[in-house]
C-alpha cells in the first residue's frame, strides 16, 4: 500500500479501457506520435475534451444566471475556458517551482504540470446538468421522494445512493471515462494524470461524505481503482483515496474564477455597480492601476485581471509550502485558498458573500430555479416508469414505448439492462441536456402549445 505519492507516477501518461471485464492499458493511434511530436500526451487530452459534444453543450448550460439573455454573461463553457486558463497559469507556475527545487521528474517540463491542470479544469464541469446546481437538486429530489421508491426497491445500497445523488463531479468523470468518444470502452481515454487531477472527491457514495459530494459512481469504480494504482494515490479506506495534488490547483482555479467573475456578470446585469466591485478587489489591487481605463467595464476587467494574478501567485506559493503533506495524503486544509494570505482569503470571501446576498437571491433567478424542479421532474416522470415497466414488469404501455424512443439516438435502454444501468442512462440523458433543450422538452411533454 502506498504511503507517499511521487511525481513520476502522478504524471503518468498511461491510458486505460475495459476489455473482457478488466481494465487494461491501451494505446490509441494519436498517442503514438511520441514525445518529440507536435502534441504531448497532455495536449492530446486537451484536444479530446475540446472537441467533445459534452464540452460543446456547456455553451447552453447555466453558470449562475439560467437562460440569460445578455451576450456577455458567463455560461458553463466560457467559465470552463477561463478556469482552464487560470489553471494552466497556476500549473505552469508550480511546474517552474518544482523544476527549480529538483522535484520534477526527468523527461517532464514545467508546462506538463500546466497542461494537466488545464485539462482537468476544462473537463471539471462536463457533468453539470441543466440549470446548474439547482438541476442537481431537482434530480436528487425526484429520486428521493417517497412515492418514487418503488422504482428503487431492488437496487443495492450503493446503486440506490448513486441514483439518488446526481453529482456533477461524478458525471464529469463518467463522461470522460465511459460516455464520450469510445462509449463504454474507456470514454475519451485520457491520461491517468489528467483523470487524477479531475478527482476533487476521490470516493463513492459509500464514503461518510458521499451523499453530499463524491466523484465515483459504481459504474466507474473499477476504472478508478486501476487509475489510482497507476498514479500511486494513497489509500484513505475502502474505495477512497487521497487526492492527486494537482486536483487542488484545479479546485483553486475554479474557486478564483467563480468568485471574481460572477461579480463581473452582476455588473453587466445591473445587479451590482462597478464601484462595489472595485471595493471588493481593493485588497488585491490599487485604484491607480486602472486609471486609464476608458469605461467602467474595462476598469473592472483590468482590476479583475490584477486580482487573479495576485491570487495565482499566492496559491502557487501555498502549494509548494504544503507539497510534502499533499504527497503524503495528509493535507489538512479545506483547500489551498483557505491557507493563502489574508488579502486573498478576504477578497474571495467578500466576493462570495456579496454574490450570495445580491446575485443568487435575485427575483428572476429564483423564479427560474423554482421552475427547474417541475421542468426536470416532468422528464423523469415520463422516462423512469417506462424503464421500470420494460425491465421489471416486462411490458410497456404505448406511451411508455414512445417515451423510450427518445433515448434511441443517445444510449437506448435495453430489456437486458439492469434497473441501475437503465436509470444511469436516463441520468446521462437528462443531465446531458442543455437548459434550452430541457425547458423545450418539458414544455412539449406538457402538451401546451401543441395545437395552433
Predicted regions, residues:
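Sequence-structural signature of the catalytic-core scaffold of metal-dependent phosphohydrolases
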Residues: 2-38, 50-61, 81, 85-86, ...
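C-terminal subdomains that position terminal phosphate/3'-OH groups for nucleotidyl transfer/ligation
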Residues: 285-421, 433, 451
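Intrinsically disordered or highly flexible coil/loop and linker segments, enriched in small
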Residues: 55-59, 148, 181-185, 204-208, ...
Amino acid at each position: 500500500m502506498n504511503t507517499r505519492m511521487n511525481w513520476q507516477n502522478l504524471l503518468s501518461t498511461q491510458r486505460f479501457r475495459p476489455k473482457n471485464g478488466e481494465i487494461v492499458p491501451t494505446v490509441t493511434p494519436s498517442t503514438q506520435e511520441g514525445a518529440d511530436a507536435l502534441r504531448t500526451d497532455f495536449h492530446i487530452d486537451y484536444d479530446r475534451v475540446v472537441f467533445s459534444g459534452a464540452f460543446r453543450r456547456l455553451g447552453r448550460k447555466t453558470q449562475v444566471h439560467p437562460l440569460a439573455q445578455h451576450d456577455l454573461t458567463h455560461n458553463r463553457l466560457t467559465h470552463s475556458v477561463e478556469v482552464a486558463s487560470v489553471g494552466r497559469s497556476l500549473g505552469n507556475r508550480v511546474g517552474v517551482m518544482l523544476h527549480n527545487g529538483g522535484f520534477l521528474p526527468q523527461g517532464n517540463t514545467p508546462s506538463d504540470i500546466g497542461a494537466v491542470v488545464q485539462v482537468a479544469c476544462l473537463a471539471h464541469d462536463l457533468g453539470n446538468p441543466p440549470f446548474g446546481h439547482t438541476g442537481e437538486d431537482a434530480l436528487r429530489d425526484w429520486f428521493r421522494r417517497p412515492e418514487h421508491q418503488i422504482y428503487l426497491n431492488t437496487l443495492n445500497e450503493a446503486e440506490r445512493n448513486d441514483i439518488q445523488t446526481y453529482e456533477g463531479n461524478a458525471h464529469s468523470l463518467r463522461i470522460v471515462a465511459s460516455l464520450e468518444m469510445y462509449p463504454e470502452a474507456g470514454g475519451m481515454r485520457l491520461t491517468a494524470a489528467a483523470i487524477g487531477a479531475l478527482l476533487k472527491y476521490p470516493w463513492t457514495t459509500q464514503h461518510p461524505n458521499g451523499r453530499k459530494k463524491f466523484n465515483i459512481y459504481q459504474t466507474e469504480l473499477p476504472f478508478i481503482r486501476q487509475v489510482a494504482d497507476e498514479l500511486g494515490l494513497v489509500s484513505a479506506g475502502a474505495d477512497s483515496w487521497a487526492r492527486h495534488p494537482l486536483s487542488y490547483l484545479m479546485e483553486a482555479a475554479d474557486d478564483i474564477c467563480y468568485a471574481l467573475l460572477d461579480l463581473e456578470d452582476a455588473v453587466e446585469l445591473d445587479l451590482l455597480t462597478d464601484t462595489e466591485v472595485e471595493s471588493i478587489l481593493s485588497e488585491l489591487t490599487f485604484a491607480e492601476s486602472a486609471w486609464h481605463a476608458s469605461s467602467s467595464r474595462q476598469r473592472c476587467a483590468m482590476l479583475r485581471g490584477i486580482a487573479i494574478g495576485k491570487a495565482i501567485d499566492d496559491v502557487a506559493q501555498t502549494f509548494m509550502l504544503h507539497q510534502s503533506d499533499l504527497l503524503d495524503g495528509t493535507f489538512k486544509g479545506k483547500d489551498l485558498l483557505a491557507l493563502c494570505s489574508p488579502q486573498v482569503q478576504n477578497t474571495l470571501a467578500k466576493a462570495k458573500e456579496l454574490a450570495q446576498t445580491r446575485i443568487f437571491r435575485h427575483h428572476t433567478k429564483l423564479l427560474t430555479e423554482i421552475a427547474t424542479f417541475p421542468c426536470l421532474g416532468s422528464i423523469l416522470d415520463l422516462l423512469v416508469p417506462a424503464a421500470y415497466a420494460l425491465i421489471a414488469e416486462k411490458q410497456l404501455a404505448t406511451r411508455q414505448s414512445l417515451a423510450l424512443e427518445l433515448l434511441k439516438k443517445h444510449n437506448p435502454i435495453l430489456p437486458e439492462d439492469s434497473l441501475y444501468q437503465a436509470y444511469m442512462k436516463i441520468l446521462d440523458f437528462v443531465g446531458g441536456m442543455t437548459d434550452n433543450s430541457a425547458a423545450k422538452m418539458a414544455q412539449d411533454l406538457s402538451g401546451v402549445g401543441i395545437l395552433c
